[in-house]
């Protein structure tokens, strides 16, 4: 999927994610509320709205226990992005369930930590993007190049990609997060 929808907090629910998936992109449901029942309803609504693949984002900072992890496993989700925390906390449970896990990283240090944790890929988010930021404010294109020197994992470029020209210049990435 060349365009992967960002899991924007409080916005990226089943309506948006299904529209993206139906249009040929890859929709992702956000779970910032941490409310397992609400997230279950959003995941199940996706099956009414699309027959296309989609993923779920799990912000680690907001996970109080493994209930959300168990939910994505029970609902047979195949792709998860994690963010805002150490992916090592839940990576093995997710991967043991056959789920592909990409972790959002705003820095080289975060990327190296995620690689060591065993993620399947990275969502590389420069300072131009939303979400949790690196205080060093490294731009996307510099960040992509610096991370690519250290790993061959698939990378999704995220942040500030608004047209085809910028899409083209994100050539160090494998896909784009918009």
Question: Which residues does each PLM region occupy?
Answer:
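Active-site entrance/lid segments in N-terminal catalytic domains of soluble metabolic enzymes
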Residues: 1-156
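Short, hydrophobic alpha-helical packing/hinge segments within bilobed ligand-binding/sensory domains
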Residues: 17, 166-167
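Single conserved hydrophobic/aromatic residue that forms the stacking wall/gate
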Residues: 168-178
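Conserved acidic functional residues
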Residues: 104, 159, 175-177
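Glycine-rich adenosine-cofactor-binding loop
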Residues: 157-163, 170
């Amino acid at each position: 999927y060349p365009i992967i929808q960002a899991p924007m907090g409080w916005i990226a629910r089943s309506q948006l994610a299904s529209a993206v998936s139906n249009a040929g992109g890859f929709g992702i449901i956000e779970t910032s509320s941490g409310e397992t029942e609400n997230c279950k309803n959003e995941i199940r609504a996706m099956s009414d709205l699309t027959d296309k693949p989609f993923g779920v984002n799990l912000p680690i900072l907001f996970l109080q226990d493994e209930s959300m992890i168990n939910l994505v496993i029970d609902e047979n989700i195949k792709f998860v992005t994690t963010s805002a925390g150490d992916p090592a906390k839940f990576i093995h449970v997710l991967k043991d369930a056959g789920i592909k896990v990409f972790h959002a990283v705003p820095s080289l240090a975060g990327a190296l930590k995620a690689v060591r944790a065993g993620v399947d890929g990275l969502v590389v988010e420069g300072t131009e993007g939303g979400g949790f930021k690196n205080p060093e404010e490294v731009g996307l294109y510099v960040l992509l190049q610096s991370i690519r020197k250290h790993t061959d994992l698939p990378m999704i470029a995220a942040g500030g990609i608004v047209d085809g020209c910028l899409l083209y210049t994100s050539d160090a990435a494998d896909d784009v997060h918009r």
